[in-house]
């Protein structure tokens, strides 16, 4: 009897695992990026990225309208290709990587906004401040993967005001404006692998 129960449990968890795997999409980090840009000295722009991040996407519909997204980003992985500036960004003037080690996003809606266009709304948390934001997302299509399954490509963008999240460092310049602008443009380029059914 115990052996029969064990077989039932193994079968149940095996089916459950397969079902979850078919719903879930695996992020290909080597072909994905989380980047940002911000005005510098009013007239130019500085860009950077986070090297350590994880994004979980699930959807069971072909039009993705039941899509759900959860993302976490390690603040300490920030890079702008300038060691001194990166160190400053990790301090309490900006992200305070020690006290607030992660940036998080959890979607609340995934709406179709045209052909291969979507509005992804959710809660973005930076420094324990949570605000609702809406990403403009473009679905770039899919292709069969050499080892089975499918590769899907997405691009999503959003702009936020850094002061809304306590990224408070501020220095004015003589010509007017700030050394670092208030608007941060965030761009995600994502490659997701959908396992074969």
Q: Where are the language model's segments positioned?
A:
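Bacterial Sec-dependent N-terminal signal peptides
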Residues: 1-23
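Low-complexity, acidic/polar, glycine-enriched regions of mature
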Residues: 21-197
């Amino acid at each position: 009897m115990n052996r029969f129960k064990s077989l039932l449990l193994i079968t149940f968890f095996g089916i459950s695992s397969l079902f979850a795997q078919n719903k879930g999409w695996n992020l290909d980090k080597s072909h994905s990026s989380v980047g940002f840009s911000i005005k510098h000295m009013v007239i130019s722009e500085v860009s950077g990225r986070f090297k350590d991040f994880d994004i979980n996407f699930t959807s069971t519909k072909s039009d993705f309208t039941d899509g759900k997204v959860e993302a976490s980003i390690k603040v300490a992985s920030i890079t702008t290709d300038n060691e001194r500036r990166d160190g400053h960004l990790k301090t309490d003037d900006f992200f305070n990587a020690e006290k607030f080690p992660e940036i998080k996003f959890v979607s609340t809606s995934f709406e179709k906004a045209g052909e291969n266009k979507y509005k992804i709304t959710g809660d973005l948390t930076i420094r324990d401040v949570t605000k609702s934001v809406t990403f403009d997302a473009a679905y770039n299509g899919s292709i069969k993967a050499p080892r089975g399954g499918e590769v899907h490509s997405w691009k999503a963008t959003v702009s936020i005001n850094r002061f809304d999240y306590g990224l408070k460092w501020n220095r004015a310049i003589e010509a007017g404006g700030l050394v670092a602008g208030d608007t941060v443009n965030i761009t995600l380029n994502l490659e997701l692998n959908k396992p074969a059914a």
